[in-house]
Amino acid sequence: MQPHTQPPQPEASSSRAVHIPSDPAPPRPCLTNDAIVSRWQSSPGFQYFWAWIKRRCDRLKGKEIIRGPFDHSAHGIRSLMNMLDQMTSWVEDATPQPQSNQRFGNLAFRTYNKLLQERLPPLIDSWDIPSNLRSQLLPLFINSHAFGHPTRLDYGTGHELAFVLGLWCCVVPGWVGGDNGTEEEEDELILRVFTRYLELTTFLQKTYNLEPAGSHGVWGLDDYCFLPYLFGSAQLLGSNLTPSASLSLALSHHPSATSPPSAPITDLYTLSLHHLTLFKFGASFSEHSPLLYSLSQMPNWVKPHGGLKKMFLGEVVGKRVVVQGIWVGGWCWGEDVPNVEERGDKNEGKGTDAGTKAPWAR
């Protein structure tokens, strides 16, 4: 295990001139009330993270998602990709149970999650990462349920955010990119690793019939995810693929399409539209996803991307019902992480923001 290292301090040019502790406080479930959630957005750790997200968006313009062999990627990228590949294979050891009365959630997902808790720590230990990174990473992946919640049998934007916070933590000590690598490695965290994560979580959603966590129903953006739309719209800024063409391309990849797709999917926005169509059916796209449909009517990606940035801060990071399950430590907050008693899972994911029932639902 490598010794503690001083995380590289962000440069002023990237709007990340904040202090991140080299000996960070251990993560804890502290986002349990609206006041603390509001404070989190102004904390040094979150400001660093948000600047990193915006920097990635700036650099993703015109770039395609990366698939295929990763033998020549940096060590950190290879380690994360191998982890996601192994996690996919663990499904074979937790085959779905027959379902009768449950609309959502196969109980075998609890078996899968138990395997994750047992197998993920030694796997990460084998990477020889800095000990201060390990202490931040495992609670984000395991305690924050970055791959879905075993009790509620659901998955949503809070779980997705926990995983991306974990990716960013890999950058903080320079294990990926940072002072010890290149920004291309950090871009690859999104274009390759995050893409692979989305494939895994979509597979888990389908295999175990996971319920959307905190869904707003017809009036939400997407029942399961948010960040791929933000990153994907950044990829498509200035692209010849218009929002309308992106939707058409996604629909052409649906298994029920009567003709072959006109082109491969090369961006996260269109990929997520495609994933969405695998779960929603029985109504037109404009009916089951009106917000995404309205974005498809825009002439270019400038307004959609800007609006998604604001929506991320307001409807994802700013909503206690979304983030309260995330374990936040010294890198994700900075100094003086709030010390709030853990309240367990019974209220996690519950809140005053009730989902909206689709008009065709009975």
From Swiss-Prot:
It catalyses: [protein]-peptidylproline (omega=180) = [protein]-peptidylproline (omega=0). Residues 340-351 have a biased composition (Basic and acidic residues). Gene3D superfamilies: 1.20.120.1150. Its EC number is 5.2.1.8. Residues 1-28, 339-362 are annotated as: Disordered. It is found in: Cytoplasm; Nucleus. SUPFAM superfamilies: PTPA-like. GO terms for molecular function: peptidyl-prolyl cis-trans isomerase activity; protein tyrosine phosphatase activator activity. Keywords: Cytoplasm, Isomerase, Nucleus, Rotamase. GO terms for biological process: mitotic spindle organization. The keyword Nucleus applies. Residues 1-10 have a biased composition (Pro residues). GO terms for cellular component: cytoplasm; nucleus; protein phosphatase type 2A complex. Belongs to the PTPA-type PPIase family. PPIases accelerate the folding of proteins. It catalyzes the cis-trans isomerization of proline imidic peptide bonds in oligopeptides. Acts as a regulatory subunit for PP2A-like phosphatases modulating their activity or substrate specificity, probably by inducing a conformational change in the catalytic subunit, a direct target of the PPIase. Can reactivate inactive phosphatase PP2A-phosphatase methylesterase complexes (PP2Ai) in presence of ATP and Mg(2+) by dissociating the inactive form from the complex. This is Serine/threonine-protein phosphatase 2A activator 1. The lineage of its organism: Eukaryota, Fungi, Dikarya, Basidiomycota, Agaricomycotina. The gene is RRD1.
